[in-house]
């Protein structure tokens, strides 16, 4: 069952400091509220084949999805009546995402669309009640969830070489959907109440326990799921 369809309309919050914002200025009416805050920002892809994005501050829910964006590298949007509006800055070779208050009382919902042709290195530092990252139709260099979340779900594409999915902020549930035939090693660094890998369930997992399938060490393309912090339920499954 594909989880991708539940991502549209969910949210994300972001913060960046010390750099000038990168705005989308397609027109004075485009995505703007009565205070002049834009609710859609984007940037041209150019000849980029790889990009890095950091999400710094927290949100209720966070949604990221790989999509065909034409000439755009990314598109980030919030509802017209949202209490937050996105800015994008670039610092040290990474894009950072910032949401500022609009003064409205609408939902703090943010959707991030990433160009599917670009290989993305993503870092989530702000935390969320629910984090959904669907890169099943895209490319990934790495995922790093450094802040806590009640629930994290990610859909992964076929990796290009070794790729690490790191969770260091803690979570009640971590669900990873990996492609068929791709070996996945799991490290429960902070321990776990329950770990299920490809249907095999174990309970009461001590910190530092490693689950590695045969052939993982020698596989050219593979995933390494590193749950540095504790998690209640950790599941590795296939789409």
Residue spans of the language-model regions?
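C-terminal motif of bacterial Sec signal peptides marking the signal peptidase cleavage site
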Residues: 15-18
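Extracytoplasmic low-complexity, Pro/Thr/Ser/Ala/Gly-rich segments
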Residues: 25-87, 233, 239
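Short, surface-exposed interaction patches in beta-rich subdomains
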Residues: 38-46, 77-79, 88, 94, ...
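Hydrophobic helical h-region of N-terminal Sec-dependent signal peptides
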Residues: 8-12
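Bacterial signal peptide processing site
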Residues: 20-23
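Bacterial N-terminal signal peptides that target proteins for export
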Residues: 1-7
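Extracytoplasmic
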Residues: 48-50, 59, 69-71, 83, ...
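Extended beta-solenoid/beta-helix repeat architectures
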Residues: 115-119, 125-128, 134-149, 156-162, ...
């Amino acid at each position: 069952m594909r989880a991708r369809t539940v991502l549209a309309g969910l949210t994300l919050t972001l913060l960046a400091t010390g750099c000038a914002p990168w705005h989308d200025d397609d027109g004075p009416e485009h995505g703007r509220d009565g205070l002049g805050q834009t609710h859609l920002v984007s940037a041209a892809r150019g000849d980029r084949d790889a990009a890095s994005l950091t999400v710094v501050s927290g949100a209720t829910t966070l949604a990221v999805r790989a999509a065909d964006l034409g000439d755009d590298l990314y598109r980030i949007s919030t509802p017209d009546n949202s209490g937050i509006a996105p800015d994008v800055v670039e610092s040290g070779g990474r894009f950072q995402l910032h949401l500022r208050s609009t003064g409205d009382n609408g939902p703090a919902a943010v959707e991030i669309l990433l160009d599917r042709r670009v290989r993305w290195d993503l870092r989530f530092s702000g935390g969320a009640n629910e984090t959904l990252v669907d890169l099943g139709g895209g490319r990934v260099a790495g995922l790093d969830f450094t802040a806590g979340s009640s629930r994290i779900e990610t859909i992964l594409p076929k990796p290009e070489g070794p790729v690490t999915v790191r969770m260091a902020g803690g979570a009640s549930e971590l669900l990873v959907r990996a492609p068929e035939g791709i070996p996945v090693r799991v490290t429960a660094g902070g321990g776990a109440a329950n770990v299920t890998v490809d249907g095999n369930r174990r309970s009461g997992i001590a910190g530092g326990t490693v689950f590695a399938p045969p052939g993982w060490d020698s596989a050219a393309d593979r995933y390494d799921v590193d749950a540095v912090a504790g998690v209640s339920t950790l599941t590795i499954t296939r789409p």
